[in-house]
């Protein structure tokens, strides 16, 4: 899982180099963080294995209550750590992981999902749109002290 996440960080760094700049030793810090997510029974952690047995995709879903000013009717399934080894796996492994995570979190009271996806990650965005997701919010970043790109 940590290796796949590291690959995704490198990919995302090209799009937003300050926001996604990996810290020195990021993998060593991320491994225990991922382990804690896996061990937390409140989370839904799923992996997909390739035919040779190596992990080629993973997902961690967490349940969160809505902010106090909103009432969607239940909790939110938040999916931030969600990575596949190669773009063509989004439609197969990625879809399978999301479907399982959504089923598990709906049983726990989730009424909606929020899936983090970078604007440049078109294969992942295509999967999410094909499953009925819509963009509800976006983050715009500006590194201070550096010229804005227009």
Where are these regions (language model features)?
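Conserved active-site alpha-helix within GNAT-family acetyltransferase domains
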Residues: 95, 99, 107, 119-137
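Conserved GNAT-fold acetyl-CoA-binding loop/helix
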Residues: 9-33
